[in-house]
UniProtKB/Swiss-Prot annotation:
Protein name per the record: Potassium-transporting ATPase potassium-binding subunit
Membrane topology: Multi-pass membrane protein
Membrane spanning stretches: 5-25, 63-83, 132-152, 170-190, 253-273, 283-303, 329-349, 356-376, 379-399, 416-436, 484-504, 526-546
Organism: Escherichia coli (strain SE11)
PANTHER family in the record: POTASSIUM-TRANSPORTING ATPASE A CHAIN (PTHR30607), POTASSIUM-TRANSPORTING ATPASE POTASSIUM-BINDING SUBUNIT (PTHR30607:SF2)
Length: 557
C-alpha cells in the first residue's frame, strides 16, 4: 500500500510539472504584456468593440476595476437565482431560490468559493448553472489571476506607479488561457462519458423494476472550468463522485491535474518574469514539501481503518466509509488533499467520513490560507504574503532591512502583510465562536461532541478561505448559516485582495537594490525551510486550540 501511494504521488507531480512548464511560459508573456502569437488582431477588435482602453492603471484603479466587475457579477447572479423560474432552460420547472440561499450562492461563486447549501439537480435550472454559475467560474478565476499578475509586476518594475490594465489582463486571461484549456478538458470529459445536453430529466427502469429519475444537463462544460479555475462547485450534489461528472479513473486524474495546473504554472511564470527561475522553483519546493507530507498523513490515517468500527469488532482494515469503491482509499486521499490545498473544494469522497486525523489535514490546509499551490492566482499571492513575512523575520535575525527581489520591505508593506494574513483566521475563529454561541448555529449540527464542532469549524474555515468543501453533516441551508458563510466568503476574498493590491502599489514605486554580500538568498534550501517554517508556525499558533477541541479531541476519545 505504501509503494502504491508513493507511486501515485510521484506520477501526479511528474505529469503536473511537465504540463505546467509550457503554460507558465505563456503566462509569463501575458504578465510582461506581450500578446500571444496570432492574437493581436483579435484583441484589437475586441478592445475596440468593448470600448476598452489599454492605458495602464495604478493600483487603486486596477483594484476598482476588479471589484467593480465582481460586484456587478454578484448583483446579476443574485437576481438571476431569485427569478430563475421566469428564465429559459428550466425543463424541470424549478422555482426561484429564497433570498438567503440566492445571496449565499451568488457570493459563493463570485468569490471563487463555490460553497453549496443546495443540491444542484433539485434546485438550479440549466440556465442558472450555465449562464450564472459557469460564467462566474470563469470571471472569479480570471480575477484571481489578474491580481497576481499585478503583484508580480510590482516586483519587476521600478519607480513606476502603474501595474498594467485590469480589463486587458482579464480579457487575455479568459480568452487565451481559461477558455481554450477548459474547452480541451470539456471535450475529453465528454469523450469519457460525462453528460453534455439540455434534455429533461430521464425516467428509467432500474434492474429491480423500480423507476428512477436521472438528472441531465450541460455538465462537462461546467466541470472543466470548475476544476481548472479551482472553483469546485458541482453540477450535482455528489460533486465529482457522481459518475455523470467524473465517469472514469482517467477523468479523475485529469481533474486533479486541472486543479493544480494554473497555480503551478504561475510559479514557473513568476521565475521567468523576475529573471531568476530559481525563485519560482523555491516556491514550488516549499509548496510541494508541505503537500507531500499532508498526502502521506491522510493516506496513512485512512488505511488504518475506522477505530470506532474496529472497537465494535467489525472488519475495517481500511476506511472505505464515504468513498467511491471505483477510486479507493489512496486516490480519495490524494484528491482530498489536492482539493483543499488548492481553493477548489470539489470532492470524490465525503470528508465528513474521514478519520479524525484524515479529516483534520484538509481542514488545516484551508486554515493556513490555501497557500499550498492554492487557488488560481490567490494561492500564489497568499504564499507571497508568507514570503514577505519570512523575509522580514530573517531580516530581524540578521539585523538588516528586509528585502525581496531587490525591493526593500518597509513598515507599510509589513502592516499590510499582517493585515492580509490575519483576515481569514479572524473570520474562522470568530465565525465558529458565533455559531457555537447561538441556537441557530448549533441546531445545524447533526453530530454531537468533538465531531460536531469539527463540522462547524470546517464550514467556516472553508468559507473564509474560499474553498467550498464541507463536512456534509452540517445542515447549512438556513438564514443564519447562509448569511454567516456569505459574509465570511466575501470578506475572506476581498479583505485579502485589497491589502495585496496596496502592497503591489507600494512596491512598484520602489527602486530595485543590487544584491550585496549581506542580502539573504531567497532561492536556496535555507529559505525554503524558513518559508515552510513560517507557514507552519503561523498555522499552528493560530488554530491549535480550535483543532484541539475538534479533530484532536475526536482522535483521542
Amino acid at each position: 500500500m505504501a509503494a502504491q501511494g508513493f507511486l501515485l504521488i510521484a506520477t501526479f507531480l511528474l505529469v503536473l510539472m511537465v504540463l505546467a512548464r509550457p503554460l507558465g511560459s505563456g503566462l509569463a508573456r501575458l504578465i510582461n504584456d506581450i500578446p500571444l502569437p496570432g492574437t493581436t488582431g483579435v484583441e484589437r477588435v475586441l478592445f475596440r468593440a468593448l470600448g476598452v482602453s489599454d492605458r495602464e492603471m495604478n493600483w487603486k484603479q486596477y483594484l476598482c476595476a476588479i471589484l467593480g466587475l465582481n460586484m456587478l457579477g454578484l448583483a446579476v447572479l443574485f437576481f438571476m437565482l431569485l427569478g430563475q423560474h421566469y428564465l429559459p432552460l428550466n425543463p424541470q420547472q424549478l422555482p426561484g431560490l429564497s433570498w438567503d440561499l440566492a445571496l449565499n450562492t451568488a457570493v459563493s461563486f463570485v468569490t471563487n468559493t463555490n460553497w453549496q447549501s443546495y443540491s444542484g439537480e433539485t434546485t438550479l435550472s440549466y440556465f442558472s448553472q450555465m449562464a450564472g454559475l459557469t460564467v462566474q467560474n470563469f470571471l472569479s478565476a480570471a480575477s484571481g489571476i489578474a491580481v497576481i499578475f499585478a503583484l508580480i509586476r510590482a516586483f519587476t518594475r521600478q519607480s513606476m506607479s502603474t501595474l498594467g490594465n485590469a480589463w486587458v489582463d482579464l480579457l487575455r486571461i479568459t480568452l487565451w488561457v481559461l477558455v481554450p484549456v477548459a474547452l480541451l478538458i470539456a471535450l475529453f470529459f465528454i469523450q469519457q462519458g460525462a453528460l453534455q445536453n439540455f434534455q429533461p430529466y430521464q425516467a428509467v427502469n432500474t434492474v429491480e423494476g423500480a423507476q428512477q429519475l436521472l438528472p441531465m444537463g450541460p455538465v462537462a462544460s461546467q466541470e472543466a472550468i470548475k476544476m481548472l479555475g479551482t472553483n469546485g462547485g458541482g453540477f450535482f450534489n455528489a460533486n465529482s463522485s457522481h459518475p455523470f461528472e467524473n465517469p472514469t479513473a482517467l477523468t479523475n486524474f485529469v481533474q486533479m491535474l486541472a486543479i493544480f495546473l494554473i497555480p503551478t504554472a504561475l510559479c514557473f511564470a513568476f521565475g521567468e518574469v523576475t529573471g531568476d527561475r530559481r525563485q519560482g522553483r523555491m516556491l514550488l519546493w516549499a509548496m510541494s514539501v508541505i503537500f507531500v507530507i499532508c498526502v502521506g498523513v491522510v493516506m496513512w490515517a485512512e488505511v488504518q481503518g475506522n477505530p470506532h468500527l474496529l472497537a465494535l469488532g467489525a472488519d475495517s482494515s481500511i476506511n472505505m466509509e464515504g468513498k467511491e469503491s471505483r477510486f479507493g482509499v489512496l486516490v480519495s486521499s490524494l484528491f482530498a488533499v489536492v482539493t483543499t490545498a488548492a481553493s477548489c473544494g470539489a470532492v470524490i469522497a465525503m470528508h465528513d467520513s474521514f478519520t479524525a486525523l484524515g479529516g483534520m489535514v484538509p481542514m488545516w490546509l484551508m486554515q493556513i490560507g490555501e497557500v499550498v499551490f492554492g487557488g488560481v492566482g490567490s494561492g500564489l499571492y497568499g504564499m507571497m504574503l508568507f514570503v514577505l513575512l519570512a523575509v522580514f523575520i530573517a531580516g530581524l535575525m540578521i539585523g538588516r532591512t528586509p528585502e525581496y527581489l531587490g525591493k526593500k520591505i518597509d513598515v507599510r508593506e509589513m502592516k499590510l502583510t499582517a493585515l492580509a494574513i490575519l483576515v481569514t483566521p479572524t473570520l474562522v475563529l470568530m465565525g465558529a465562536a458565533l455559531a457555537m454561541m447561538t441556537d441557530a448555529g448549533r441546531s445545524a449540527m447533526l453530530n454531537p461532541g468533538p465531531h460536531g464542532f469539527s463540522e462547524v469549524l470546517y464550514a467556516v474555515s472553508s468559507a473564509a478561505n474560499n474553498n467550498g468543501s464541507a463536512f456534509a453533516g452540517l445542515s447549512a441551508n438556513s438564514p443564519f448559516w447562509n448569511c454567516l458563510l456569505a459574509f465570511c466568503m466575501f470578506v475572506g476574498r476581498f479583505g485579502v485582495i485589497i491589502p495585496v493590491m496596496a502592497i503591489a502599489g507600494s512596491l512598484v514605486s520602489k527602486k530595485s537594490q543590487p544584491a550585496s554580500s549581506g542580502t539573504l538568498p531567497t532561492h536556496g534550501p535555507l529559505f525554503v525551510g524558513l518559508l515552510i517554517g513560517t507557514v507552519l508556525l503561523v498555522g499552528a499558533l493560530t488554530f491549535i486550540p480550535a483543532l484541539a477541541l475538534g479533530p484532536v479531541a475526536e482522535y483521542l476519545s
